[in-house]
Amino acid sequence: MYRFCTLFSGSSGNSTYIGTDEHGILIDAGKNAKQVTLSLLEEGLSPDCVEALFITHEHSDHIGALRVFCKKHGIPVYASRGTLEALDKGGHLNGDFPVYEMSEFADVGEFHIECFHTMHDAAESMGYTVELENGFKAAVATDLGVITDEVRAGIIGCNTVLLESNHDIGMLSNGPYPYPLKRRI
């Protein structure tokens, strides 16, 4: 039996668990490690069943638990080259856990994970499809401003799809972004 659990979604943090009761992966870990752990436990999942963390992009609401959770549980991190470079520049990759560049696909335990580019104001934002050995296939794409042809191609054939986006005019108007960016958004 597969599990697809949105642990959190939104500007305060994003994280999704895909797998079974015994083994799975996280896509993003956007709150602190304690909150990620508690959310997993609330779903009846042990944090030790997480075999890898896949990062969609480097924004804080997607990586809050990255260092502490991955170090504590000894799990690897997968992300695009651009995201890994941004994470390294920001001091988020400290050598306490394995890091892998995600360019096309990865196999982690019984999971086959493929990536596709998404359009977002980040170094190299990605969405992921996850296929289990039993044929169940799920996709996660976050912070979508537009669904591109590449996103469409990435989600075709999935049993479950999580498309996440939000648009808060007040947050945008009062935020730190320069006017041309605010206008484009």
Model segments located where?
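Cap/insert and terminal regions of metallo-dependent hydrolase folds
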Residues: E150-I185
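Structured catalytic core of nucleotide-sugar glycosyltransferases
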Residues: C5-S15, T56-L66, L84-D88, I113-F116
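Metallo-beta-lactamase
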Residues: S80-G135
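Active-site neighborhood of phospho(di)ester-bond hydrolases with catalytic His/Asp-centered motifs
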Residues: L26-G30, E51-E58, Y78-R81, A139-T142, ...
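Active-site metal-binding motif and surrounding structural segment of the metallo-beta-lactamase
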Residues: A33-A79
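Conserved beta-strand hairpin/beta-sheet module of binuclear metal-dependent hydrolase folds
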Residues: M1-E43, M126-D143, T160
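Active-site glycine- and acidic-residue-rich loops that bind
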Residues: V140-R152
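Active-site environment of divalent metal-dependent phosphoester hydrolases
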Residues: S60-I63, L84-A86, A122-A123, V146-T148, ...
